[in-house]
Amino acid sequence: MKLKITTAQKIIITLLVLACSVAGFMLKLPVMFRHHDKEMHAAFYFVAAAFFTLLFAGKNFWIHGFIVAALATFGVVIEYAQEYSNSLMRHRIHGRFDPEDVKYTVMGLLAFSAIWVAYLLGAWLFQAQPKSSEADSDQ
């Protein structure tokens, strides 16, 4: 069964996910998760790249590249927003800008991109191979 999603539905889904992501990133992590912050950045952006690539790009390399660039930019903007939010509030609601978070954001994006490109190459290689029954029937 193939699920058909309209462009308007994709945009609504994207805006909802974006709003939840911003809200989630602007809150301070509970104590039990603070030592896993870097891994959570990598995992979140890995899943986000997979989600948006499946939603918008399919097998289009350029759209995937745009998605990865947009998510990387989002990651940097969120880090700056976290730092800025601390200066707006009377109490600290989040940590400081952390270049390590940006590093792990990029690592998560690159990890998904590597898997996605390997999948596309594998699909292309196996699709390009003629079936043995077709090759035998041509003779």
For each feature predicted by the language model, list its residue ranges.
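Bulky hydrophobic segments
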Residues: M1-E100, V106-Q139
